Amino acid sequence: MPALGRGWSVGTEVEFEHGGTEVAVEKETEETGEFEQEVERGGEVALEQFWVQKSFNKHLNVRAGHIVVPVGMTNNGHTPNMFFSVYRPEGEKTIMPCTWHETGISVWGKAGSWRYEAQLLPGLNSNLFNDQGWIHNGSASPYEFRPANALACAARVDWSGIKGLRLSLSGYLGGSNNNDIVTDPNGKYYKYNAVVAIGAFDFAYKNQWLTVRGNVDYGHLSDAAAISARNKNQTTMTGNPYPHTFVGEGAWDAAVEAGVNMLAWSKTKQKLYLFGRYDQYDSYVPADGLADIGWCARTVVSGGVNWCPIPEVAVKAEGGVRLLDSQYNDEPFFALGVTWTGFFIH
């Protein structure tokens, strides 16, 4: 985060997509509105954060640009040294955008043991909501730009008044209907707001021996039955980006993980954590009149090892099982990962 002087600074986070995973969709209005997929962006550099900040004092800072939305534990701490699992915690990354980043403005500051942040952002796109991931895809525009016909706000408060302990509340509120490149003011679904409301609590406790983290998230979508009907009847034209599924009126997640540092007794600066993790979530709580979808409720139990030879590097191994309703097969898994997290500050 280079400092520019007089309280000005700039920050950025860059992601290198080597696999050609980024594909853009274009809507050709002169060709009967057909969708075309363009792969020119594939394999390019993705910009996850880029902002300019003015700091007046520790109590008041104003940040504008492409910023992270700190709703939930994982979005607030999305670097791999902030969780034990090889992949990002499953519940939060399933039901919410993760890492959630938007172009907007943020006001934040600190006072004693408290830290606050409030943001003004573009709303999500309910055309991209689905049963498997609730609003997860709502912030990731398939186009080469991000429509912003609706506004939203997010906020977070952290308290760290006890050594090693952090308690946090965060939330989000914003409309999501008619926030696409094409809207129909005369259509039967135009009148709905499809307001997304999320409330989240998370905590972390860390000392020399023990690290414990946990979170509870609940989200509600107004007009979910109407949005589900609209999404099921979206265009099926070749190349369209829409999932064509129902979307839940609600979604929730609760998770906890704990790790013991087996090297805490020694003089080494290395860390070797043995950890366990429990995650339960449901990405589809149906609106009245809509049937439940059993496989959307999942429980994940896992455990493993994190070895940190230096603070920036973690070698991770994790094994576990994803438990579903009795009519579905449970899903055992094993994962290995090597992570590096570093910050360049000038």
Where are these regions (language model features)?
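Loop-centered beta-sheet repeat module
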Residues: S126-L128, G133-D180
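Active-site rim elements
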Residues: E38-V39, E92-T94, A140-E144, H244
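Outer membrane beta-barrel
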Residues: M1-S126, N149-A154, D158-L167, E249-G250, ...
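Short aromatic-enriched loop/helix-cap "lid" or pocket-rim segments at secondary-structure transitions
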Residues: N75-H78, F129-D131, I181-V182, I227
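Outer-membrane beta-barrel pore domains
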Residues: T29-E40, F50-Q53, G164-H346
